Amino acid sequence: MELVFIRHGFSEWNAKNLFTGWRDVNLTERGIEEAKAAGKKLLEAGYEFDIAFTSVLTRAIKTCNIVLEESNQLWIPQVKHWRLNERHYGALQGLDKKATAEQYGDEQVHIWRRSYDVSPPDLDPQDPNSAHNDRRYALLPKDVVPNAENLKITLERVLPFWEDQIAPALLSGKRVLVTAHGNSLRALAKHIIGISDEEIMAFEIPTGQPLVLKLDEQLNFVEKFYL
């Protein structure tokens, strides 16, 4: 069986080189075109889906919609869930990456961005831009909504969704598309493929490129490739 991952198209804050995380930003024109191209690739390669999973952030939802529209599958069920959100970048969200490196030093920012288990500084829950003040997450327990995450914590967040929804869908024979974010998809890929804590740091998923994971009947990893 095959599972398809797509990282959302290039966003407004990708273009501005800002830390995004759980902040909700839109796609750029480039991002829209990336999503259209991804949908056309899937159509040309004959990929059909029974269900699509995405996050509750606009850039991923729009990418999912565009991909499905371009591949003539906008009618299939979509499940939006916060567990597929991007990694939460804490107090760095909204900050310029270059300016942050100048303030804290390249090495410290590199550790925050690329180490597996070191989180950036927490975002104050009282901050107007905190997810605690976003009605998308109003029904979640306060201790579930993050103030900052590293990739290890992100994996711990996405894993229950894999086990409860994505894996059962695959095992039931459904053809699955997951349209999400760089780090939530990297976390899932780490679990599925069996990538080590060290190797995952160099594992990147480009925006708008369909990544196909081939799995056996027990969901063991076989191979991966981009369309």
Curated annotation (Swiss-Prot):
**Pfam families on file:** His_Phos_1 (PF00300)
Instruction: Tell me the domain of life.
Output: Bacteria
Enumerate the residues binding substrate: 7-14, 20-21, 59, 86-89, 97, 113-114, 182-183
Q: Per its UniProt entry, what is the enzyme's top EC class, as one word?
A: isomerase
* KW Kinase (keyword) present: no
**SMART domains from the entry?**
PGAM (SM00855)
Q: Which residues form the active site?
A: H8 (tele-phosphohistidine intermediate), E86 (proton donor/acceptor)
User: Does the entry feature the keyword Electron transport, yes or no?
Assistant: no
Name the SUPFAM superfamilies on file.
Phosphoglycerate mutase-like
Q: Which GO terms describe its biological process?
A: gluconeogenesis; glycolytic process
Q: What is its EC number?
A: 5.4.2.11
Keywords noted in UniProt: Gluconeogenesis, Glycolysis, Isomerase
Q: Which GO terms describe its molecular function?
A: phosphoglycerate mutase activity
Q: Which reaction does it catalyse?
A: (2R)-2-phosphoglycerate = (2R)-3-phosphoglycerate
Cite the annotated pathway. Answer: Carbohydrate degradation; glycolysis; pyruvate from D-glyceraldehyde 3-phosphate: step 3/5
InterPro entries referenced in this protein's UniProt entry, alphabetically: His_Pase_superF_clade-1, His_PPase_superfam, Phosphogly_mut1
How does the record describe its quaternary structure?
Homodimer.
Of which family is this protein a member?
Belongs to the phosphoglycerate mutase family. BPG-dependent PGAM subfamily.
Q: What's the stated role of this polypeptide?
A: Catalyzes the interconversion of 2-phosphoglycerate and 3-phosphoglycerate.
Among HAMAP family, the record links this protein to: PGAM_GpmA (MF_01039)
Q: Which NCBIfam families match?
A: pgm_1, PRK14115.1, PRK14118.1
Name of the protein described by the UniProt record: 2,3-bisphosphoglycerate-dependent phosphoglycerate mutase
Q: Which source organism?
A: Histophilus somni (strain 2336) (Haemophilus somnus)
Recorded name of the encoding gene: gpmA
